[in-house]
Amino acid sequence: MKVLMFGWEYPPHVFGGLATANYGISQGLHAQGDMDITLCLPKPFGDEDRSACQIVAMNAVPIAYRDVSPEYVRERVGNIMDPDLYFRLRDHLYADFNYMHVNDLGAMEFAGGYPGNLHEEINNYSIIAGVVARTLDYDIIHAHDWLTYPAGIHAKQVSGKPLCIHVHATDFDRSRGKVNPTVYSIEKNGMDNADCIMCVSELTRQTVFNQYHQDPRKCFTVHNAVYPLPDEYQAIPRPDHTGKDKVVTNRRSEERFSRNDE
């Protein structure tokens, strides 16, 4: 199976927990032996582990035509993406985006991480996804968290392929209930258009169909995996905590505060 995966960060450049989760999922799917993963990242740096997936640098995907040579493309983006892919992508431009802020390759730059203009970058990412979706061959679309839901929706609209979104957290979790209406709208739109919703916990799954009004039949709990400890760590003797006597020493709060006031 060929997977077109949209992510926002990837080790070793970790801005949050999403990078680690994305890496683990990519490695886990690759280990199945029958998965071909293409991972789209807004700003890869070239030192990412590519053993489990091919990486598409979204900041090197043209959305406007530029007459450039293979040598120039290799010099500019050869360290982050296969230069031949640039020309394949350029053959699938679907609109004239010269009015946008594009560079000498006809591509848009990304700050990386979570900049102040995050919503603008999310929109730009989804525009670029349209070129990628028209170029590559894939069977299913996997979008990680709300940042990439618009890109996943665009790819589904272009290809008709099923969309699986991965809910690592909802804005109800991140904001402790003080939900940003713009973020909520993006999240709900992603869920409404998804064929499958993967939730990292049963609590998240309950939030998805209670707060976002989704059909429970398309919501699945898929817990994050853990790496087993190496044998040398498991062999370390553990302290014996079978004793009954416990001694706890501390000063009373009143005493501590009264001394601080002196």
Q: What are the language-model segments listed below?
A:
Residues 3, 140-142, 149, 153-174:
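Active-site proximal beta-strand in glycosyltransferases
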Residues 28, 34-133:
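A conserved catalytic-core segment of Leloir-type glycosyltransferases
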Residues 118-128, 162-164, 172-189, 228:
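Nucleotide-sugar donor phosphate/pyrophosphate-binding loop at the beta->alpha transition
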Residues 130-135, 157, 180-197:
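Membrane-proximal helix-turn-helix segments that form the acceptor-binding/catalytic region
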Residues 141-142, 193-201:
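A short beta-strand/loop micro-motif in the catalytic core of glycosyltransferases
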Residues 203, 225:
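Carbohydrate-associated surface elements
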Residues 239-254:
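Conserved donor-binding/catalytic core segment of Leloir-type glycosyltransferases
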Residues 255-262:
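Conserved small/polar residues in nucleotide/adenosyl-binding loops
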